[in-house]
Amino acid sequence: MFVMSSSSIPNGIFIIDGQERYVNPEGDVESNKSERTSKASMVFQMCEKQCRDENGFKCHCMSESHQRQMQVLGQNPTRVVNGYSQEFEQTFLDLMRRSHRFSRVAATVVYNEYINDRLHVHMNSTKWATLTEFIKYLGKTAEEEKQEREIQKQIERASAGCEGKDVVVDDDDNDDDEKKKDEDFRLKKVGFALGLGVKERGESSKLVFGDEENDKVERGDKRKRSALDELMKEEEKKKERMNRKDYWLFEGIIVKGVVKRVIDKYVGEIEMLESKHVLRVDQVELKTVLPQIGGMVKIVNGAYRGSNTRLLDLDTEKFCAKVQIEKGVYDGRVIKSIEYEDICKLA
């Protein structure tokens, strides 16, 4: 073994006592190279193999075991990725339950604790590219589960409810308080007074096309609509606003004649059915025509403007029709109530 002054000792690797040693600028002898580079720089999740450097990476890629694992991955990559994703999610949530069950903590803190495990599933092996995407996925999943629970509670209240009584359920957005909610859940009694006489309930009325009408009697507080119903209703209103126009002429519809051509949206060239004469008429002078039940009609105004549909039924009292869309994005959708003025017979 030899000794040099600290001022003259360079930074490098020397053979000391027959072993490869690293000498830093301060003159301290550190452990050998293999110990200094023990931290893996490359990890194969499928092979559960860690490589320290580029040479080890190349050697492993050429090995037979790696080729077999790549063949397994190529046969069904979706199943493999989903498997790692489920394992990552389960382990991440288990760590949260154990370490941060009753506290609010940042996702990065939990993730840093998670990756301390040398055998953890790496994020690159899952279907989430970043931790942010994974957290958004957890939030979305929790929201869907909450909606399902809300819908199930509404069904139970509708089945078990009776006139004059209501089941009051307090919803809490915090999943950590599930046990507390279950303990505090109680059925509250609602006081009510009857008048001198009670009107007997008649037979339930029918809807336009033979469907039984649901009981619409108010029982105190109005029931909350599910988020899905609200979204669907808003989407219908948006489409109605966008497609509701003050003109409705389309080529190929029958209006006591056949519209051969539409001019400036409001004027059409009409071919008379009997005389075959062609006239130019403003839409104010025209009226829509309805075929027999089962005939084809075009929706000329409203949310589904331009769609070809089949006439299923008519309600002469409310001047509405029931149609089913054929072809297109909304193929098969049934519109239970649409006004006569919004549909017209196809030629």
Swiss-Prot record:
**Cytoplasm: is it a keyword of this entry?**
yes
The UniProt entry's sequence similarity note says:
Belongs to the KIN17 family.
Q: Which organism is it from?
A: Arabidopsis thaliana
Q: What are the top taxonomic ranks of the organism?
A: Eukaryota, Viridiplantae, Streptophyta, Embryophyta, Tracheophyta
Checking InterPro entries in the record gives: C2H2-Znf_KIN17, DNA/RNA-bd_Kin17_WH-like_dom, KIN17-like, KIN17_WH-like_sf, KN17_SH3, KOW_KIN17, Rib_uL2_dom2
Gene (UniProt): KLP
- Which residue spans adopt a coiled-coil conformation according to this UniProt entry? none
Keyword check for Nucleus, yes or no.
yes
Location within or outside the cell: Cytoplasm; Nucleus
Q: Chief subcellular site?
A: cytoplasm
Pfam families for this protein: C2H2-zf_KIN17, KN17_SH3, SH3_KIN17_C, WH_KIN17
This protein's GO cellular component annotations are: cytoplasm; nucleus
- Motif Nuclear localization signal (NLS) located where? 222-225
Where on the tree of life does the source sit, at the highest rank? Eukaryota
What protein name does the entry list? KIN17-like protein KLP
Q: Which UniProt keywords apply?
A: Cytoplasm, Nucleus
Q: What is the purpose of this protein?
A: May act as repressor of root growth during copper excess and of hypocotyl growth in the dark.
